[in-house]
Every structure is written in C-alpha cells, then in structure tokens.
C-alpha cells in the first residue's frame, strides 16, 4: 500500500478561470520556437543554420559543456530564424513547420531488454534528456553524474493547474513505459494526489508510489523530495514532469519523438477555459485569438501565475509548461483609497479584507500588480506558514543575499528550487523577488562548486 503524507502548511489560491474538463481543437500552429533560456544551466551551441531543413527530433542546439545533451526540433520544417541578443547570446530558434512531417527514426526499443546506460543513450540521442532536471541547482541534469533517485510529481497544486489525469487519458501505456525506462537508470519515486484515482497512477509498476494530501505547494517535486528522501551535500537526484514521462514512453513505443502536451488554457480573462493539444514551442496566436477579453490590458503567461513566464499574445509555449494563463494587467486600474479600501473581492492571507467571510470556495480575479514597493525584510515567519519543508526559509534567503555559501549549505539550499519559494514570494509583505534571489544563489553556488 502506498505511503500517505499529509501536509499541514500551504495555501491554495482559488482563482477564476479553471479549464473545463474537455479538449478542444485549435488550428495547427505554423511556427515553433525553442528558447535556450527555458533550459536552465545550459550554454547553447547552435548546430543549424537559417533556411536549413530539420526533421522532428533533429538537433537545433547542444550544450557546450556536454555536447551529448541535444535540444531537438519538435517538428520538421525550415529554420526561419536564429535570434541572438547582446554578446551573441542565443535567444531563440524558430522552425516553420512543413505540411508533411518527417521524423528522425531512433527505432522501437523494448525497455525490458535495455540497461540504464542504453536507456540514457536513447534519451540523449532523441533530445529527451533535456527535460530532466537535477537537484542540487535545479538545472538540466548532468549526464555524467549518476542520480541517487528520480522523482516524478503526477499532480500540480498551483493556481488553475491542469489535471494530469485528463492528460493521461489514452496515454497510460506510454506513461508506464516512461516510468519503466527511468527505473532502469535509478530508483524512481512517483508522487500522486490523494484525489487521483487512475489505476495508471495508483497501480504504477517499477516505482515507489507516495500519496500526498495537502494545500499548495504539495504538488511541488521539491516539497515531495524533502518528505521522502531529502538531498544531502554530494548527492544528486533527477526530477521530470509527468507529461515528459509520456514523451519518453512514446519514444520507446514508436521509435520517434512526439512532444505533444495537453495544455490547460486558464485565467479570468479567457472566455472559454479548456484544454488544447500543443507541441512544445508552439506559436500561441491561434489559442488566444477570439478567446480573451477585449479592450483591456492583459498579462499573458506561459505557465501559472506564480512561476510562469510573461509572454505576448503572439508568444510561444514554454518547453516545460502545460498551462497558459491570462489575467488582467492592472495597469489601467484606479482605486479609491488604494489598498486600504475595504472590499470583498480581493484575496488576502492575513484577513486584511472581508473576503475571508465569503468562504474558501470563492473564486478571485487577481491582476498582475505588486501593490507595493520593496521594503526591508521582516522576520515574521510568514514564509514558514506556506512552505512545508524542513528548512528555515527566511534565514536561507538572508544567507543567499549575503553570499554566505557555508550558511546556504547548512540551511538546505541543495534541496530547493525557485518554484519552492513562489508561494513565499506571493505572501511576502516585503515584496521581495524570492524566486530570483534563490535562482541567483543556486547559480553562485554552482559556479563555486562545479
């Protein structure tokens, strides 16, 4: 029987605009873009030229430090642009999809007949290794370092998060094959929600299943690692999102890559929130067109409101994202008395407004305003109330700001990723950019230690 872990700390932010449990058709996008910045820790080296034809699964760029780690095209077509920024930094590579799709063939493989080294080689050749991240540092995994374990979180507790069970429908065999492949490399842990009932999750084979019950961030893989098998200095673990596990299963079962995700289109400004099928890097114009509020300043996000990336209405789906969100920008809002005005429709963790009297099921419409400037850091334990990890978050943040590596190590920086502090950032009365601070701290530590 699966182990049950109940979390008492956390906070659910109930927003308006949850996706209906249906998959709607959208016009196939004509362009796909990969951004190296989506793959944290990678120094890209472009291996294609503009106007060159690539097949789906063909490499677009590799990691300079580990050339065996390839980042491949999700579709076949012509490379229309290689965009560079300051100091020739590679910003993005765009491919115009061909009418007829051609695939790099990697050959169907029986996972049972392979060992861990052969599985890893297959993932590297097909570009799927790029979707595996490692702790410490929360970067694309180093293929030369053997992981102690691999963690998969099969549920998401972020605001308006997609239901993985809907995405899993019809992909059960591919998901199990993906788990089988990962289990060949290292012991694999699968974390599921107490509300998930799919046999593909509750009865998954070759993995250790753990059931979590709690508020957000219970779905964060970092929180799960902290409660199952914490990361110590000198240890490495891998993490991978569940839809990328499906990618792996498709590779072994079909012999070619298929980066199609089931994506939730959410947010208070989406007219018909629902699910769509999109490949990684897809142009999103057709998704938002005639499906968002008009005559209003909007914030488009690839991902969720806490950890997602701001994009334009003509942006692209992020490599690791299975959610799109549209909320009001808030730049055109003028409120009498500002934030001190009594109200029933604004969310507050400290009951500053009367909205808490409306019950936990009330759906809120929140905009992108910070509503305040950065202030001195207040040691009020407000982070502790929403972070169910065995660390001292406020002291860790102070150690990162001070650049004290010894203190950072002692306070648990090897276990965390920026997303683990997203909720802390939301409730922070000092308005500090905690995710950026943690990212800077991890980068500094990696430069010193690697």
Question: Predicted regions span which residues?
Answer:
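Short coil-to-beta-strand transition motifs
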Residues: 68-76
């Amino acid at each position: 029987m699966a182990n049950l872990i109940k979390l008492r700390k956390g906070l659910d932010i109930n927003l308006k605009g949850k996706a209906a449990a249906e998959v709607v058709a959208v016009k196939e996008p004509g362009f796909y873009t990969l951004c190296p910045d989506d793959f944290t820790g990678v120094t890209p080296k472009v291996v294609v030229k503009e106007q060159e034809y690539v097949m789906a699964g063909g490499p677009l760029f590799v990691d300079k430090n580990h050339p065996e780690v390839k980042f491949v095209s999700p579709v076949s077509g012509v490379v229309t642009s290689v965009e560079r920024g300051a100091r020739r930094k590679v910003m993005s590579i765009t491919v115009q999809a061909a009418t007829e799709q051609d695939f790099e063939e990697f050959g169907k493989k029986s996972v049972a007949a392979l060992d861990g080294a052969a599985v890893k080689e297959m993932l590297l050749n097909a570009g799927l290794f790029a979707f595996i991240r490692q702790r410490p540092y929360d970067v694309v995994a180093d293929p030369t370092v053997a992981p102690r374990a691999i963690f998969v979180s099969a549920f998401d507790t972020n605001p308006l998060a997609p239901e993985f069970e809907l995405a899993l429908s019809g992909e059960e065999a591919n998901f199990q094959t993906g788990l089988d492949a990962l289990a060949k490399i290292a012991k694999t842990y699968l974390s599921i929600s107490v509300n998930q009932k799919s046999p593909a999750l509750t009865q998954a084979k070759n993995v250790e299943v753990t059931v979590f019950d709690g508020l957000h961030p219970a779905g964060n893989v970092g929180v799960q690692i902290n409660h199952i098998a914490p990361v110590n200095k000198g240890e490495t673990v891998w993490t991978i999102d569940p839809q990328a596990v499906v990618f792996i299963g498709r590779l072994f079962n079909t012999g070619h890559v298929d980066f199609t995700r089931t994506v939730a289109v959410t947010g208070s400004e989406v007219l018909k929130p629902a699910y769509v099928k999109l490949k990684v890097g897809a142009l999103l114009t057709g998704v938002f067109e005639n499906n968002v509020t008009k005559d209003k300043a909007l914030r488009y996000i690839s991902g969720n409101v806490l950890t997602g990336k701001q994009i334009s209405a003509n942006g692209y789906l992020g490599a690791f994202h299975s959610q799109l969100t549209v909320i009001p920008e808030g730049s055109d809002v003028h409120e009498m008395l500002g934030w001190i005005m009594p109200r029933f429709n604004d969310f507050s963790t400290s009951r500053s407004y009367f909205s808490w009297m409306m019950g936990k099921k009330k759906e809120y419409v929140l905009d992108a305003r910070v509503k305040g400037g950065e202030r001195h850091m207040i040691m009020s334990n407000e982070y502790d109330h929403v972070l169910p990890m065995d660390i001292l978050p406020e002291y860790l943040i102070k150690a990162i700001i001070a650049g004290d590596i010894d203190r950072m190590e002692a306070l648990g920086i090897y276990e965390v990723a920026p997303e683990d502090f997203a909720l802390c950032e939301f409730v922070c009365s000092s308005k500090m950019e905690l995710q950026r601070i943690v990212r800077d701290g991890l980068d500094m530590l990696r430069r010193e230690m690697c």
